[in-house]
């Protein structure tokens, strides 16, 4: 019986794949969906045959590049929580989410090409993002830094709003200030005793 297991990529093949995805994201974001695959392969330092071995079609490369950005964003959460307080980890992740949204906008035409061909590059992306945000919020609440009544979807909408209002590269300083304001609204604050007593009388 033939094995159906997928063999892990060799180190050099894995490195080539990661290089191709990195170059592809930049190319599709800045040059549009019609950038030649030959130019992507050349910039990654591999032959066109290597590109096609990993990604048989243009659409496959676009979808893989987009999904790789999403995976990197979500997979980085445990390391952030391991190396810094949860509220700082959330603020750092917010910056990364802004970068991810900028990449997504830059790849909009390329992603539409994938969708037109029957693909669904956005499948399960919302669920993965909600899970990532939820992990950060829970850790923050457990550490006493963040409120427990926060819906991860509300945080995602808030960051997306910042990206829409100040998502241009020259607006990053303003975007940072807006994200600071958003995080401030998520912080846990002990009830004011005097206000609580007044409410009880």
Descriptions of predicted regions:
Residues 45-55:
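Short hydrophobic/aromatic patch on the recognition helix
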Residues 13, 66, 70, 122-130:
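Amphipathic, non-transmembrane alpha-helical scaffold segments
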Residues 64, 75-103, 121:
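Hydrophobic alpha-helical connector segments
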Residues 92, 98-135, 161-168:
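Short secondary-structure transition hinges
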Residues 1-5, 99, 127, 131, ...:
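C-terminal peripheral helix-coil segments that are non-catalytic and often amphipathic
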Residues 1-43, 60-63:
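Basic, helix-initiating cap at the start of DNA-binding domains
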Residues 61, 94-97, 159, 182:
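Short alpha-helical scaffolding segments that buttress acidic/His motifs in well-ordered protein cores
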């Amino acid at each position: 019986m033939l094995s159906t297991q997928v063999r892990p990529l060799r180190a050099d093949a894995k490195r080539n794949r990661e290089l191709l995805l990195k170059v592809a994201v930049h190319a599709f974001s800045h040059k549009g969906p019609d950038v030649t695959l030959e130019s992507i392969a050349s910039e990654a330092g591999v032959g066109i045959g290597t590109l096609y071995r990993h990604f048989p079609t243009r659409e496959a490369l676009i979808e893989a590049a987009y999904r790789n950005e999403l995976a990197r964003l979500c997979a980085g959460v445990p390391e952030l929580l391991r190396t810094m307080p949860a509220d700082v980890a959330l603020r750092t992740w917010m910056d990364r989410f802004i970068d991810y949204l900028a990449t997504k906008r830059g790849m909009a035409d390329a992603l539409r090409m994938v969708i037109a061909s029957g693909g669904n590059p956005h499948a399960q992306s919302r669920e993965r993002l909600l899970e990532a945000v939820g992990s950060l919020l829970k850790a923050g609440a457990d550490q006493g830094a963040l409120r427990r009544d926060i819906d991860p979807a509300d945080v995602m909408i808030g960051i997306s709003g910042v990206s829409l209002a100040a998502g241009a590269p020259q607006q990053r300083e303003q975007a940072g200030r807006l994200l600071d304001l958003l995080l401030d609204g998520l912080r846990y604050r002990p009830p004011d005793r005097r206000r609580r007593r007044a409410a009880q009388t």
